[in-house]
From Swiss-Prot:
Belongs to the phosphofructokinase type A (PFKA) family. ATP-dependent PFK group I subfamily. Prokaryotic clade 'B1' sub-subfamily. It comes from Cronobacter sakazakii (strain ATCC BAA-894). Its EC number is 2.7.1.11. GO terms for cellular component: 6-phosphofructokinase complex. Mg(2+) binds at residue 104. ATP binds at residues 12, 73-74, 103-106. Homotetramer. InterPro entries: ATP_PFK, ATP_PFK_prok-type, PFKA_ATP_prok, Phosphofructokinase_CS, Phosphofructokinase_dom, PKF_sf. The keyword Lipid biosynthesis does not apply. CDD domains: Bacterial_PFK. This is ATP-dependent 6-phosphofructokinase. The gene is pfkA. GO terms for biological process: canonical glycolysis; fructose 1,6-bisphosphate metabolic process; fructose 6-phosphate metabolic process.
Length: 320
């Protein structure tokens, strides 16, 4: 019977992580469990930096961005002897299970702990919305709001100067955030990692828009596809239109979480405790069709893939 649990946040931070921690803590305490927060993710787990949390530890946290427990990259956690130390640190406190909030890299750490016999539950916390087994991740909707607001501001100045603007959006190798923001922001052109990119084709489309009387345009592109400063120079040379590139960067990860992220994080945190009390370990939580679901964390990492929203892209093209 589980009596004590740990909770940590790992990888890149996302708005709503604090709400998720709060959900875990409050639900666990309601069920009579003790909760330990781990500072700085797996690094803190290895370095034995933990603190017992009570209801007041998470007061006034639901509206705060970032993660008050901190997060850190710790690639050494892939080493078994490092994980063995982490498990021993938890066991000496009587911790029976661990809730991990983060992206697929964080899930990999939880998977490896599970394979060593220590039960973990993963919650999807990343603005990239690139975790399998869930329709949405904690932080995605807040980041979407931030990106759309930035696009709206860029449109104001692009319109004033009859300029082409390129805006680079986070997402790693998933275009969900870019695609949704582009539709909501009315972007004329969208470049995604799921679709082969050819800059000559993009310029041809921009020229076609200019020929139809288009005075300005916004190109939304997911990070890591190309150097957008070089792309801006190329577009300006080919179209003879002033072109500017904007990298939104880490501003997308910050800010107070929007209501949906607060609700999603709270539900997922409480559901993680429900699963642990039912004897589940090695699972990851998701939301599908607005219902809480859980999947085998190993299967989610190794076999499940997020479907590409091709119908969304086709819709966007009709609206150019």
């Amino acid at each position: 019977m589980i009596k004590k649990i740990g909770v940590l946040t790992s990888g890149g931070d996302a708005p709503g992580m604090n709400a998720a921690i709060r959900g875990v803590v409050r639900a666990a305490l309601t069920e009579g469990l003790e909760v330990f927060g781990v500072y700085d993710g797996y690094l803190g787990l290895y370095e034995d930096r933990m603190i017992q949390l009570d209801r007041y530890s998470v007061s006034d946290m639901i509206n705060r961005g970032g993660t008050f427990l901190g997060s850190a990259r710790f690639p050494e956690f892939r080493e078994e002897h490092i994980r063995a130390v982490a498990i021993e640190n938890m066991k000496k406190r009587g911790i029976d299970a661990l809730v991990v909030i983060g992206g697929d890299g964080s899930y990999m750490g939880a998977k490896r702990l599970t394979e060593m016999g220590f039960p973990c539950i993963g919650l999807p916390g990343t603005i990239d919305n690139d975790v399998a087994g869930t329709d949405y991740t904690i932080g995605y909707f807040t980041a979407l709001h931030t990106v759309v607001e930035a696009i709206d501001r860029l449109r104001d100045t692009s319109s004033s100067h009859q300029r082409i603007s390129i805006v680079e959006v986070m997402g790693r190798y998933c275009g969900d955030l870019t695609l949704a923001a582009a539709i909501a922001g009315g972007c004329e052109f969208i470049v995604l990692p799921e679709v082969e990119f050819n800059r000559e084709d993009l310029v041809a489309e921009i020229k076609a828009g200019i020929a139809k009387g288009k005075k300005h345009a916004i190109v939304a592109i997911t990070e890591h596809i190309c150097d957008i400063d070089e792309l801006a120079k190329y577009i300006e040379t080919e179209t003879k239109r002033e072109t500017r590139a904007t990298v939104l960067g880490h501003i997308q990860r910050g800010g107070s979480p929007v209501p949906y992220d607060r609700i999603l994080a709270s539900r997922m945190g409480a559901y993680a405790i429900e699963l642990l009390l039912q004897g589940h370990g090695g699972r990851c939580v998701g939301i599908q069709n607005e219902k809480m679901v859980h999947h085998d964390i190993i299967d989610a990492i190794e076999n499940m893939k997020r479907p590409f929203k091709g119908d969304w892209l086709e819709c966007a093209k009709k609206l150019y």
